A protein has these predicted regions:
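Acyl-donor-binding surface of acyltransferase catalytic domains
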Residues: 1-30, 38, 123-125, 147-149
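Helix-loop element at the rim of GNAT/NAT acetyltransferase active sites that forms part
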Residues: 32-44
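A conserved beta-strand-loop-helix scaffold within acyl/acetyltransferase catalytic domains
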Residues: 43-93
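Ligand-binding pocket scaffold of soluble enzyme catalytic domains
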Residues: 76, 106, 140
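Short acidic/polar active-site loop segments enriched in Thr and Asp
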Residues: 83, 119, 139
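Conserved acetyl-CoA-binding loop-helix of GNAT-fold acetyltransferases
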Residues: 89-94, 98-111, 115, 135
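Conserved active-site alpha-helix within GNAT-family acetyltransferase domains
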Residues: 103, 127-143, 150
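Conserved GNAT acetyl-CoA-binding A-motif
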Residues: 113-125
Length: 150
């Protein structure tokens, strides 16, 4: 969880990077998501269809993509409700990971959400993403584990 009323952005965008809302260009948004989560072609097509349907239904979703020299390298989904923001689908193209692109994208989208009245932001994180989210200022609410019986 992140208190946006006290949040100060920690990282500016690199000069060659741009953040854009890509609701009308979901294919660009999908490239980093697919690369980061290693979903096959069919999986991302189903995911795109669900996101297109949600946008068509007027759901409070926005899709953001960070471009470097016009290449989509990092992406996320923002859900906004009165006073509350949620980040999902945070991913960076594998060959661009570790360069601060996701952190820069998160900071830009947090500023966007705050400007639209969000006071709190939440997200779910895997162990792999914890350092990025902590760097962005998020604090854990709780830990949980998933078990599988084979």
């Amino acid at each position: 969880v992140l208190d946006l009323t006290r949040h100060e952005p920690r990282q500016a965008l690199a000069a060659q990077a741009q953040v854009r809302c890509t609701d009308l260009r979901l294919e660009d948004w999908a490239q980093p998501v697919q690369s980061a989560f290693e979903s096959g072609e069919g999986g991302i097509e189903q995911y795109l269809a669900r996101h297109r349907a949600a946008l068509s239904a007027g759901r409070a979703l926005s899709h953001f993509t960070l471009y470097v020299e016009e290449r989509p390298v990092s992406a996320l989904t923002l859900s906004l409700l009165p006073g509350l923001a949620r980040l999902d689908d945070i991913g960076t193209v594998q060959d661009c990971q570790g360069q601060g692109y996701a952190t820069a994208l998160i900071q830009a989208v947090l500023a966007f959400a705050r400007a639209r009245g969000a006071r709190t932001c939440v997200l779910e994180a895997s162990l792999d993403g914890l350092s990025i989210y902590r760097k962005a200022g998020f604090k854990p609410l709780f830990d949980y584990r998933t078990f599988c019986q084979e």
